[in-house]
From Swiss-Prot:
Function according to Swiss-Prot or TrEMBL: Cell wall formation. Catalyzes the transfer of a GlcNAc subunit on undecaprenyl-pyrophosphoryl-MurNAc-pentapeptide (lipid intermediate I) to form undecaprenyl-pyrophosphoryl-MurNAc-(pentapeptide)GlcNAc (lipid intermediate II).
Record has Acyltransferase as a keyword: no
Annotated membrane topology: Peripheral membrane protein
Keyword Transferase among UniProt keywords: yes
Lineage of the species this protein comes from: Bacteria, Pseudomonadati, Campylobacterota, Epsilonproteobacteria, Campylobacterales
NCBIfam families according to UniProt: murG
Encoding gene per record: murG
Protein name: UDP-N-acetylglucosamine--N-acetylmuramyl-(pentapeptide) pyrophosphoryl-undecaprenol N-acetylglucosamine transferase
Length: 340
């Protein structure tokens, strides 16, 4: 099979694309990538050897633009649309998988115009604008939050499943402020640090590179020994050591925590598009798999109320809920659809 994978802009979308191309390579399928010169697409895939070819077309997001900016963005998408048509023809592409984001627009519409089956993965509980437009025309629409989705789950690296373990008593809490930092989560960690130390609970804290020095100084003033980092590539092993996570609820991190069977207290980023982080976390709460609270609420009181709880039921439920090999299932589904 010859597959085009398109989409990106941000890391969450691109991690799904990465999972899909790895599944393609493992099953002996050829994949090309069509992305954008904007965003993080080049950083992720310019040197990726699993794609036979990669293309970065000049596009930008359309939704948040106004006036002349929107017209220019639409013109760039139109130009990239014709370039994508030529690329799809050149490689004799049989199917296209969109992982969403503004980078996906040109190749997705080009695929439909060439009658190439379009498969879509939606990473968030609230559909992105582009995916909402394309969904009626898609051969398959995959979402971990949709009961009607033919494939359940979210593409997560296998290491998070391998490191999964059943949690019960809380002996270690990991605070995930993200690579850029999340002041609300960092401040929450500092506000409970003395209480956690008094209870004998260890602290692992990814504070983000921007806020690292402030948080480091604050722990020193408190006299609390926390395992602190700004950014780390060792997230799977850090998660594995924790019994509770305090985190934002971007889709990739949320489902990695679920795969690890790590019960989590989610504090959504309040300015996410369409408030999707809140709705991602609400899905987990509605399934009784975790906790969620807005930044402006009493985060400290909620976290302290969680600490005495036995987490075995939630951790076990997470193990049973999370699906393994989702990327492989998505690629197998494309092959079966083409052969039907």
């Amino acid at each position: 099979m010859r597959l085009c994978i398109t989409g990106g802009g941000t890391g969450g979308h691109l991690m799904i694309a990465e999972a899909l191309v790895e599944a393609c390579a493992n099953d002996g399928h050829e994949a090309i990538f069509i992305g954008s010169t904007s965003g993080q697409d080049r950083k992720y895939f310019e040197q990726n050897s699993k794609f036979s070819h990669v293309y970065f077309l000049q596009t930008t997001g359309v939704v948040n633009q106004r006036g002349l900016g929107k017209l220019k963005a639409l013109w760039l998408v139109l130009r990239a649309f014709f370039a994508s048509r030529a690329i799809l023809k050149k490689h004799n592409i049989q199917a296209t998988y969109s992982v969403g984001g503004f980078s996906a627009a040109a190749a997705s519409f080009a695929s439909l115009s060439r009658l190439i089956p379009l498969f879509i993965h939606e990473q968030n509980a609230v559909y992105g604008k582009l995916n909402s437009i394309l969904k009626p025309f898609a051969t398959r629409f995959i979402s971990a939050y949709d009961e009607a989705s033919p494939i359940k789950g979210y593409p997560v690296k296998d290491i998070f499943f391998k490191n999964a373990r059943l949690r019960d008593e809380i002996k270690c809490v990991i605070f995930l402020g993200g690579s850029q930092g999340a002041k609300a989560i960092n401040d929450l960690a500092l506000s409970v640090a003395l209480e956690l130390e008094a209870r004998g609970v260890k602290i692992i804290h990814q504070a983000g590179e921007r806020d690292y020095e402030r948080v480091k100084s604050a722990y020193e003033e408190l006299g609390v020994k926390a395992e602190l980092c700004g950014f780390t590539k060792e997230m799977p092993s850090l998660m594995a050591r924790a019994d509770l996570a305090v985190s934002r609820s971007g889709a990739s991190t949320l489902w990695e925590l679920c795969a690890n069977a790590l019960p989590s207290f989610f504090i959504p980023f309040p300015h996410a598009a369409s408030d999707h982080q809140y709705h991602n976390a609400k899905f987990i709460v509605d399934n009784e798999l975790g906790w969620c609270q807005r930044e402006e609420e009493d985060l400290r009181a909620t976290l302290l109320s969680i600490l005495p709880q036995n987490l075995a039921d939630k951790s076990k439920a997470l193990m049973e809920y999370s699906s393994r090999d989702v990327a492989k299932k998505m690629i197998t589904d494309v092959v079966m659809s083409l052969n039907a």
